[in-house]
């Protein structure tokens, strides 16, 4: 048995602070993933509905079984230290009201050792934490043809980027999910935040930037704005008002596809002096309006409004092992969703069971 090593210092100068248990960061992150992270991922994927909306699959509570082998056995026999993941899966037939519930095996999941490592095929490995840009709202400026350009970016933890810009023509533009730029006032009309020119002026002021933007904006109704935005986001697809509305809803306001995360919500609230609850991790109309007001004030050179330093550690965060694995698990679940929908449409509703619908291969492959 391995004896515990004791650290002894022969230095004459006392240490300024006791060395913290650095492995605890990895351990706590993984334990949080096993409980909260998996629950969040399953909740985001539920419910999965069939194309005719008759059948519905919902994920419930999950649990881990015991590892089949010890850490030492896995090292010696070139095996992976893992434990089975089991989840309650409920299948509901909305036409008959019949409910089938089963505890479904979701695959063997690599487990973390006490040293914060994983044993994969007998080899000890670690997941390295990443230093990434924190979700939130960021302001920047750059020179273009001798003119100062001001930009605002709303960056989520997961989902479409929203970028606003006061361009070299002094017009307020928006780019949704890195697509072609378009008038920001058209975007406000499409969302129903401000439909008429008077509404927009009342919301954002009557500056020269707003006047020039409204002059360029060809869509004067919400329906026109929705059609125009859909044309630019999905060129080639037949544009309809309903399709455009559901597209914008899915891109920016659907928790399954858009997530600021709690840290992103905190950063947005702090930057824009908002009081939105931390649990609200999708965009709100208030977020968009406050972002535009700050950008216009920044472009006008008003006191107290400044650009952000992207490289400042205050604008970065650590993405630890639990979050990294959760992101991979989320990818596997989204691939599995497509398989579940296909099987729902191919099998007889009365013969389907939760176990027959769930295919764990996409999840195992993603992890």
Feature-to-residue mapping (PLM):
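N-terminal non-catalytic structural scaffold regions of very large proteins
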Residues: 1-367
